[in-house]
């Protein structure tokens, strides 16, 4: 089982070999999880249950302007990359076009293969993420090629109320994956 060291963005040299018995489940997580080419033809389709997990917001700024799912995803990524990968806003913004191409190629074509959908968006998360990302986006210099992108996100965040409720977010919340303080990763 490969392991990625996200602090340097490379595969770690050590891994584990797993052996499963017939009654043991396998959970495949990640952008390729729904890709049918991932499993060998010997795998019995009747034993497979696929779940598509994504941030699929249904929130609106008003009666005419919805918050796009991509807005939630880029906020999550900006905060997570800064908090856990020591990545600047410019670095993450610079990778966003590649991330979107990867979604179009490796995720969206296979989402219909899912047997179930799990929406991970929380109603209050944009208000929480704003606290982390807003001041960092304000520091992107005007001469940066990502300045316009940063300003667009700041403009969007200006419509969002702040929420200082971190103490009330449980350590098992999906939001903790992005802001830190979760039960699962140290």
Listing of model-derived features with the role each one plays in the protein:
Residues 1-26, 87-99:
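ATP-dependent small-molecule kinase phosphotransfer cores
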Residues 25-29, 52:
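Structural recognition of the conserved hydrophobic beta-strand(s) that form the central parallel beta-sheet
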Residues 31-34:
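Short beta->alpha connector loops
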Residues 36-186:
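Conserved NTP phosphate-binding and transfer environment spanning the P-loop NTPase/kinase superfamily
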């Amino acid at each position: 089982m490969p392991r990625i060291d996200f602090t340097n963005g490379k595969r770690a040299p050590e891994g584990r070999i797993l052996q499963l018995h017939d009654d043991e489940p396998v959970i495949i997580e990640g952008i390729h999880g729904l890709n049918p080419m991932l499993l060998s033809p010997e795998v019995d389709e009747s034993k497979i249950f696929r779940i598509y997990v994504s941030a699929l917001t249904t929130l609106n700024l008003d009666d005419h302007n919805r918050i796009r799912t991509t807005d939630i995803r880029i906020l999550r990524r900006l905060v997570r990359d800064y908090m856990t990968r020591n990545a600047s806003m410019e670095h993450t913004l610079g990778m966003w076009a590649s991330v979107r191409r990867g979604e179009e190629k490796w995720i969206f074509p296979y989402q219909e293969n899912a047997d179930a959908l799990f929406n991970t968006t929380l109603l209050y998360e944009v208000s929480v993420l704003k606290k982390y990302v807003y001041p960092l986006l304000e520091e992107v210099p005007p001469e940066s090629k990502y300045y316009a992108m940063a300003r667009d996100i700041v403009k969007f965040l200006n419509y969002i109320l702040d929420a200082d409720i971190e103490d009330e977010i449980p350590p098992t919340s999906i939001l903790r994956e992005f802001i830190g303080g979760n039960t699962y990763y140290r």
